[in-house]
Amino acid sequence: MANLIDNTARSAASDARAARHPEKQKRADTPVLRKPDWIRVKAPLGKTFSETQKIVKDGGLVTVCEEAGCPNIGECWEQKHATFMILGDTCTRACSFCNVKTGLPAAVDTDEPRRVAEAVAQMGLNHVVITSVDRDDLDDGGAQHFVDVIEAIRAATPSTTIEILTPDFLRKPGAAEAVIDARPDVFNHNLETVPRLYLSIRPGARYFHSLRLLERVKDRDPAQFTKSGIMVGLGESKEEVMQVMDDMRSAGIDFLTIGQYLQPTRKHAAVDRFVHPDEFKAYETIARAKGFLMVSATPLTRSSHHAGDDFAKLRAAREQMMARG
């Protein structure tokens, strides 16, 4: 086993050269907590990992696995699972928790839907997760591109189930509806944190707008599964987490994910504490009691981790619920 790759150890000179986060360079370094023993992952090695890496590279594609520094990349890529990040590698937002590059994005690549669909077919995916950067520069926030990708995958591999993890489409009238009408199997949009921390952690977003986005999915297509997640370890209280759960259930959200926040670099928000695995188990118990069909709550839980297996469980849970009447 190997510890997580620690990007926080990079020097200031290295950060400046990389310039992934130009808006963060003037921020003071934040303290870095030593990771506990329970946060351990396998090093990304093996033939299948390399094969997945080659498919992504040859297709000129971007994955959130790489861009966000996901700790589960070794496990997922060894199983030929990858989360494709469309609409480029540059985000128009500057959330203090996120490792994705920020700045002025390039023009939309209209050939990307074809290449994503081709990669899905090459990898033999039964379930695929598609996410994107925020594209506040586009009139529709990138909604039509999501639709194009969904349609391309359905044309190439009709049996593949599709999960999308979308931006909030803030101030983009009709954008969310266009994506909902493309009928992905799972519509995911992460609330990320509790309302009190939005200004410091997710300053470009609005908590109740994000919540309403997920509610609109259910209003427009009640059969569509909805999913959302939060990070813990940012300074939230247990009571605040439980209130978020209640808000999500009021919006009809089916699937909740809760994972430990991990600090990408010293210029990002600091970890307030590492939440013990027993606390995650308690959160899972509480969430299930509140009526979520599916809950994943562990230190290394991420939105797309085990997404295919979880989708099968989610669908089975709904069928059981309907059978009970």
Curated annotation (Swiss-Prot):
This is Lipoyl synthase. Belongs to the radical SAM superfamily. Lipoyl synthase family. Pathway: Protein modification; protein lipoylation via endogenous pathway; protein N(6)-(lipoyl)lysine from octanoyl-[acyl-carrier-protein]: step 2/2. Residues 1-31 are annotated as: Disordered. It is found in: Cytoplasm. GO terms for cellular component: cytoplasm. The gene is lipA. It holds the Pfam family LIAS_N. The keyword Metal-binding applies.
